[in-house]
């Protein structure tokens, strides 16, 4: 290896200085002093980089909106009840996407009825196991699907409801009546890779729920036989929605499917999503469809960032000075959604109209594949191997849009975490943990303002999901909070606490650190006679994590000899162990890399705290917007305990597989990871050098910022 940094280290005694950048929230600034020559070493500082824009939509597995019911007590009635952005409820990680969202389902299960306690739902969803009903699902139910785009695996959207009993409280002048339920979309396996280019057609279904207003009806959509739109929300699953075609016997060539369907085009090369939301009309013999087989109500336009998209929905069936008897008359500036599936095969979305009159959810997918794996006829193109179904050619190369990994310390395993293209939001066990304080920059998720108003380089905190806090008190499952209740198992009577240390305040698109899961048993769980103070705390697992928003491959630089500097977390063992945390302090854990983008090579070194010789050297090759390589210790090994002067145990790592990526708009940041469980070679070296019996092992995550010379 011809590494000038390593060659220089062999001739001179480097002194490293690592200090925080006062104005930039922490900086990696390591400078060496050559004792053989008086010339000063070059000084570096972090490059300035564009900070992430504030994200109105923080992403998630899915969202639901509940139907409204208006108080219509004479003389004390509410004139209207609008929909609000705050009405969106996170669904959490679904048990299975085809099943109803657990949180919202448990709410509706408790709704009282006058006799019919069935939960009715979209025909393609899994029937409810509700003890008193069959959920109204059956083979003869009306259809709702886009032709040729029916076999969803990762995302489902739909509706479910009960014929709720009227709420009558005459002493408080209150009467509410009408159905109670939700519309929703939710998915699993948010996409880590998407097609790098090309245009792909997605089709699916969409659903709506309206506000309530005295005297309001939507006769072009729903027959207001029970005062839908007036006393309670009109919605796409209402039994009086009679104007969309739901039956195969009346399907026409110009129909795109059954019910309310979507037709979207995703231009992955230009990161754009466009499309339309339509109704497939039931009959030409009425005045609601202008003698067409389909009626378009919205056009969608969104920008794709990572595996998420945000944009607008424009109402297309509206005219000035004309009253429409449907709710789709206002544009929306709140369209958001995301891609699900290993290659972005499916997507889900939602929006609320700007007039707060209607909320919409939907799901769409690429063309269904036939049994032989080819896309069904009529597609814009069959998928090539390695591409999403419906992609247009063999050129459907995939690109990685994010990294999110967890490395366990006890068994040295690496597993993928879910992520919604937000490095500042950790998703573990279906629970979303904000890594940065609410009052910080860039959409409430940036720097940690620490002591004396300064910026802390790393942040340490504890996070207890709201659901678990309540479960610990009541021992029952809770609903509606922005967490996934009990997704990691039965937490009733327990409080699961996550201890997190995250680095670094000068990294905007990359976050990495330490994660510890703890279960605190309640007094009842700890023992019948125990007091709350006696509740036992069990440390479940300690691990490391890294997640980052990958640079667009078209934006990867072509420069040579680009310097990145940063820090790292490490755990190294061979019987005894050494651990070190990220730091910007002088003598702390240090990382330095030289990247030759032109030749697609990366070399680097990780140096442990209070050491001069590097702990690991790393060599790798750049592939697209990421890199792979190997890490190894020096031939003399790594001293695990410097204080043991007579018999210092050592670790020998010969061939640890490193993976990583470049992050930010212009590859301003890089990071990577490796977990090395040991091998026969290191076991032999360990036994020879330190008289041990176990193979050396290591777990490491690292991150660094691009540097520029100090002017």
Curated annotation (Swiss-Prot):
Q: Where is the composition biased (Basic and acidic residues)?
A: 96-105, 457-472
SUPFAM superfamilies in alphabetical order: OMPA-like
- The cysteines covalently paired via disulfide bonds are none
Is the keyword Signal in the record?
A: yes
This entry's comment on induction and repression of expression is: By iron starvation.
Q: Which domain of life is it from?
A: Bacteria
Q: Which residues form the signal peptide?
A: 1-20
InterPro entries named in the record: OMP/PagP_b-brl (IPR011250), TbpB_B_D (IPR001677), TbpB_C-lobe (IPR035316), TbpB_C-lobe_sf (IPR038197), TbpB_N-lobe (IPR035313), TbpB_N-lobe_sf (IPR038669)
Task: Note the subunit structure.
Answer: Binds only human holo-transferrin (TF), via the TF C-terminus. Forms a large complex with TbpA and TF. Interacts via its C-terminal domain with Slam1.
Miscellaneous comment in the UniProt entry for this protein:
N.meningitidis cells will only bind to human TF, not bovine or porcine TF, explaining at least in part the bacteria's inability to cause infection in non-human hosts.
Q: What is known of its domains?
A: Has 2 lobes, each of which has an 8-strand beta barrel flanked on their N-terminus by a 4-strand handle domain. TbpB stabilizes the TF holo C-terminal lobe's conformation.
Q: Which family does it belong to?
A: Belongs to the TbpB family. Isotype II subfamily.
The molecule here is called Transferrin-binding protein B
What species is this protein from?
A: Neisseria meningitidis serogroup B
């Amino acid at each position: 290896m011809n590494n000038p940094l390593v060659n220089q280290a062999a001739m001179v005694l480097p002194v490293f200085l690592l200090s925080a950048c006062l104005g930039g929230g922490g900086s990696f600034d390591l400078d060496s002093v050559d004792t053989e020559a008086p010339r000063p070493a070059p000084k570096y500082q972090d490059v300035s980089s564009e900070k992430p824009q504030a994200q109105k939509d923080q992403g998630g597995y899915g969202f639901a909106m509940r139907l409204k019911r208006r108080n219509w007590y004479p003389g004390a009635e509410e004139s209207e009840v609008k929909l609000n952005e705050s009405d969106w409820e996170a669904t959490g990680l679904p048990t299975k996407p085809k099943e109803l969202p657990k949180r919202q389902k448990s709410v509706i299960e408790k709704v009282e009825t006058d006799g019919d306690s069935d939960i009715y739902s979209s025909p393609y969803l899994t029937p409810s196991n509700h003890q008193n009903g069959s959920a109204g699902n059956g083979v003869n139910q009306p259809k709702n699907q886009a032709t040729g785009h029916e076999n969803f695996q990762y995302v489902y959207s739909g509706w479910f409801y009960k014929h709720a009993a009227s709420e009558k409280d005459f002493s408080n002048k209150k009467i509410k009546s009408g159905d109670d339920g939700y519309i929703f979309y939710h998915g699993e396996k948010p996409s880590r890779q998407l097609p790098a280019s090309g245009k792909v057609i997605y089709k699916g279904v969409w659903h709506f729920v309206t506000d309530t207003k005295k005297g309001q009806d939507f006769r072009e959509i729903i027959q207001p036989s029970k005062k839908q739109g007036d006393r309670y929300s009109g919605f796409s699953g209402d039994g009086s929605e009679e104007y969309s075609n739901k039956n195969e016997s009346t399907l026409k060539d110009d129909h795109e499917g059954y019910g309310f369907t979507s037709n979207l085009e995703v231009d992955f090369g230009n990161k754009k999503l466009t499309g339309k939301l339509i109704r497939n009309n039931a009959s030409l013999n009425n005045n609601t469809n202008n003698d067409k087989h389909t009626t378009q109500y919205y056009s969608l336009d969104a920008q794709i960032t990572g595996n998420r998209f945000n944009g607008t929905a424009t109402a297309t069936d509206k005219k000035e000075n004309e009253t429409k008897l449907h709710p789709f008359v206002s544009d929306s500036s709140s369209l958001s959604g995301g891609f699900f599936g290993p290659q972005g095969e499916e997507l889900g979305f939602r929006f609320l109209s700007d007039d707060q009159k209607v909320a919409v959810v939907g799901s769409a997918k690429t063309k269904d594949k036939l049994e032989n794996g080819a896309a069904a006829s009529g597609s814009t193109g069959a998928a090539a191997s390695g591409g999403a179904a419906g992609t247009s050619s063999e050129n459907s190369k995939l690109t990685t849009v994010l990294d999110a990994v967890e490395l366990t310390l006890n068994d040295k395993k690496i597993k993928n975490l879910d992520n919604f293209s937000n490095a500042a939001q950790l998703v573990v066990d279906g629970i979303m943990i904000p890594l940065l304080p609410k009052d910080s920059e860039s959409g409430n998720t940036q720097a940690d303002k620490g002591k004396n108003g300064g910026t802390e380089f790393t942040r340490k905190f504890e996070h207890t999901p709201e659901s678990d806090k309540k479960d610990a008190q009541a021992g029952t499952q809770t609903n509606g909070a922005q967490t996934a209740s009990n997704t990691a198992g039965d937490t009733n009577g327990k409080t699961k606490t996550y201890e997190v240390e995250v680095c670094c305040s000068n990294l905007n698109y990359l976050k990495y650190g330490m994660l510890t899961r703890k279960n605190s048993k309640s007094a009842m769980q700890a023992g019948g006679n125990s007091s709350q103070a006696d509740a036992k705390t069990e440390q479940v697992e300690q691990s490391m994590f890294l997640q980052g928003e990958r640079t667009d491959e078209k934006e990867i630089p072509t420069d040579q000899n680009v310097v990145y500097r940063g820090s790292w977390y490490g755990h190294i063992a061979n019987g005894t162990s050494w651990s070190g945390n990220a730091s910007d302090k002088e003598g702390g854990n240090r990382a330095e890399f030289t990247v030759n983008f032109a030749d697609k090579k990366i070399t680097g070194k990780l140096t442990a705290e209070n050491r001069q010789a590097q702990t690991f050297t790393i060599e790798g090759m750049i592939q697209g917007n990421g890199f792979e390589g190997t890490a190894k210790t020096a031939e003399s090994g790594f001293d695990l305990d410097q204080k043991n002067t007579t018999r210092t145990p050592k670790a020998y790592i010969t061939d640890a597989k490193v993976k990583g990526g470049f992050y930010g708009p212009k590859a301003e940041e890089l990071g990577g990871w490796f977990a090395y469980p040991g091998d026969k070679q290191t076991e032999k070296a360990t036994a020879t050098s330190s008289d041990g019996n176990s193979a050396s092992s290591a777990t490491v995550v690292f991150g660094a910022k691009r540097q520029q010379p100090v002017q």
